[in-house]
Amino acid sequence: MNQYVLYLVCLVAGYLIGSVLFAELITKLVSNQNIRELGNGNPGAYNVFRNVGKFWGVLTGLLDAVKALVPMWIAYQFFHITDTTALGCIGIGAVIGHGYPLYYHFKGGRAASTLLGMYAYFIGIELLIALAVDVIVLFGFIKKEYGIWGPSILIALSGILCLFFPHELGVKILVWIGALITLFFNRDKLTEKKEKVPKKVSRQQS
């Protein structure tokens, strides 16, 4: 098979798998509700965690990660695809599919968990180190709502760490392409400004 045809096939395959939104399926199955009508309306693991149940949120996040991790592993183990770019196209395709899912009118989630699935395949050691640091920073120092900051720190730190590990250049490029795509999907949350609640001014009665 022509190299570029292989890349296209892997990208499309990853995209079709990534287009399955487990947040939609699990929420409907467990509570018979539409995840888009709950919380912030985002069809992602964190919204399921907060509005459907912690267990179901964690399960959703794991399944979203599996969308990238398992197809990449299967492609390597059973289809003997060793080309780093081809494997990366599966992961990138899954990330794009989660953000612009074919089966849900191209309205998807933020794809952080799916990207972390790709990271688990390519840069597993860096991901584990970043996870440990992330937990310490979030719960030891910041002590704020997990929200967007947990995944953002994890993704950024994993990407930075991979630059200092002996990976081939293609892996590092794919890791950062995935990070930039996910950053694009999260652009509204990262630039969001919280409204300040005006303080009540007490007036002395004359």
Residue spans of the language-model regions?
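Short, non-helical or kinked segments that cap or interrupt transmembrane helices
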Residues: 34-42, 103-116, 144-154
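Interfacial segments of multi-pass membrane proteins
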Residues: 49-52, 75-78, 112-143, 157-165
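C-terminal membrane-associated helical module and adjoining short loops/tails
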Residues: 159-206
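Helix-coil boundary and interhelical linker segments in multi-pass alpha-helical membrane proteins
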Residues: 1-10, 70-89, 120-127, 162-174
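Cytosolic, membrane-interface loops and tails of multi-pass inner-membrane proteins
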Residues: 25-57, 108-109, 189-206
